[in-house]
């Protein structure tokens, strides 16, 4: 379980793919111990299991289902990934509960830049639109955000400069 507040990012240094699975390696400045192999890390909103640790490099195995439902099928070396360690009992929750079980992706329809903030309008299928609530929470690339508007086949979120600075959303 995570809360969608991103303080760290990682950079993809290796991608090994075939039609049934992929493995990725991230370079990060999070400190990991070998004992953390098997622990969960939220990567772009997806709960992934750490399979290998070597210095500041961490590896993950991505199943066919994960590749189908997330944006990991299109990642490449050099891409920046939002990362968040799992919540610990008793710690502050600043965003909303993010399980890391991704249902689908959305397509950016429009980005409106207002001074240093952004409004992003996403297209989403009817199947998933019915799950959205205006002023409800949504996780985009693992970032806890509020849905500011829902229309026919779109929803809208607003992003403040602080969030753009700390996350990979600036790369959308």
Task: Name each region found by the language model.
Residues 1-172:
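Conserved loop->alpha-helix
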């Amino acid at each position: 379980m995570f809360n969608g507040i991103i303080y760290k990012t990682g950079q993809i240094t290796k991608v090994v793919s075939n039609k049934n699975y992929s493995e990725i390696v991230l370079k990060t400045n999070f400190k990991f111990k070998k004992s953390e192999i098997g622990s969960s890390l939220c990567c772009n909103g997806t709960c992934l299991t750490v399979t290998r640790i070597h210095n500041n490099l961490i590896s993950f195995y991505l199943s066919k289902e994960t590749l189908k439902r997330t944006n990991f099928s299109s990642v490449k070396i050099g891409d920046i990934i939002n990362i968040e360690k799992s919540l610990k009992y008793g710690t502050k929750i600043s965003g909303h509960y993010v399980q890391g079980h991704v249902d689908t992706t959305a397509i950016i329809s429009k980005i409106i830049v207002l001074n240093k903030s952004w409004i992003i309008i996403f297209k989403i299928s009817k199947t998933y639109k019915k799950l959205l609530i205006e002023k409800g929470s949504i996780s985009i690339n693992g970032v806890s955000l509020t849905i500011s508007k829902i229309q026919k086949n779109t929803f809208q979120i607003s992003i403040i400069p602080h969030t753009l600075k700390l996350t990979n959303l600036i790369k959308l």
